Amino acid sequence: MADYIVKDIKLAEFGRKELDIAETEMPGLMACREEFGPSQPLKGARIAGSLHMTIQTAVLIETLKALGADVRWASCNIFSTQDHAAAAIAAGGTPVFAVKGETLEEYWAYTDKIFQFPEGTCNMILDDGGDATLYILLGARVEAGETDLIATPTSEEEVCLFNQIKKRMVESPGWFTQQRAAIKGVSEETTTGVHRLYDLHKKGLLPFPAINVNDSVTKSKFDNKYGCKESLVDGIRRATDVMMAGKVAVVCGYGDVGKGSAASLRGAGARVKVTEVDPICALQAAMDGFEVVVLEDVVADADIFITTTGNKDVIRIEHMREMKDMAIVGNIGHFDNEIQVAALKNHKWTNIKDQVDMIEMPSGARIILLSEGRLLNLGNATGHPSFVMSASFTNQVLAQIELWTKGAEYQPGVYILPKSLDEKVARLHLKKIGVKLTTLRPDQAEYIGVTVEGPFKSDHYRY
């Protein structure tokens, strides 16, 4: 029986062609293969990967395998899988469980499958959003007697998660506890997952070391900002074919993702307004030339609404009922609770096409909801370009190597890769875009207190 679940394995040839192109745009990952391939630093690592199953992720998976790892993979979002990418990886012999448009029940079943190594126990997690880590740690707590944790689900997602935990406990008593003990470490890709890790550590519930990949400069200041700058408008266009020039767009949040999103919409000609709770980010938005407003003041007039905050209930039902006819509502934060989609379930829904729904309000006005409030750049398009993802995923590879080869040196907690590796990741991507670095003279380096080779900035420097 085939150890994979994909939409159509016949898509593998198409996926391989796109994967080959992506490799030419991902110099960091290819450099990792060249540098570390001979030494096989991940030999013995059994990595459970939960991250969007895209063409770019396929290059990451094959890099991890080239460095000696055994890998099983699922997507971290029900809409983000590129089916031809999943097929290419499955055809190459990697167990992958990912289908674009999978149900929430299937999502958690597939998350369970990435831990089911036929030989040996999973000992590493590569996570995006923290669901794989959550699954193991929550299950272990329930096995320890905290059954109240899964007694009262508050969402459809929790219903499916809790049912999957119960199913695994019946099939394999004690499995979660054994699995938790075997994990040497986790590397986390995104802001939301990092928040979860810090919260777990604060509560004394993180039993192994974790590397916060998101806050590597070459991730958050590039993937989050420049990636969103290209992929947000791509998703809106593919979903709606609407002309954005002249439209009023509201971006909720002005962190790195919000900055990239606002720039994306401005570049398309939209008149962009920003909402913020943080006075520093609000001041940045204003000085970048955006009008900073509260949502209630613009909700009736704007054409496009995008959430980027990582928080819950940012756009609520009362906001959507005030929106103009055919307003577009979407999210580019990791989870689907930034928009109160559950509150819309009793309204009239008309599916326009995959991941595009028209919802009628009691007033008769309609809104266009993208990807059911999940990541629209991956649900309605194909996510960030390969080049920027190369920087993010090179950090992931380095984090996995660090945890696997030096895990004994780390106590449970959340760590960041050293500045020297951050600069290395950036350096690996310069030649591809024709960048030439100036070299400090020894006297200049001494004058500013650094070495000629770097690192060039202190750990507290804010890029």
UniProtKB/Swiss-Prot annotation:
Pathway membership: Amino-acid biosynthesis; L-homocysteine biosynthesis; L-homocysteine from S-adenosyl-L-homocysteine: step 1/1
Cofactor: NAD(+)
Location(s), subcellular: Cytoplasm
Catalysed reactions, semicolon-separated: S-adenosyl-L-homocysteine + H2O = L-homocysteine + adenosine
EC number: 3.13.2.1
Binding site for substrate: T54, D128, E189, K219, D223
A single GO molecular function term of this UniProt record: adenosylhomocysteinase activity
Cofactor binding, per record: Binds 1 NAD(+) per subunit.
A Pfam family reported for this protein in Swiss-Prot or TrEMBL: AdoHcyase_NAD
GO cellular-component term (any): cytosol
Binding site for NAD(+): 190-192, 224, 253-258, 276, 311, 332-334, 377
UniProt keyword Metal-binding present: no
Subunit structure comment from the entry: Homotetramer.
Family membership noted in the UniProt record: Belongs to the adenosylhomocysteinase family.
Name this protein carries in UniProt: Adenosylhomocysteinase
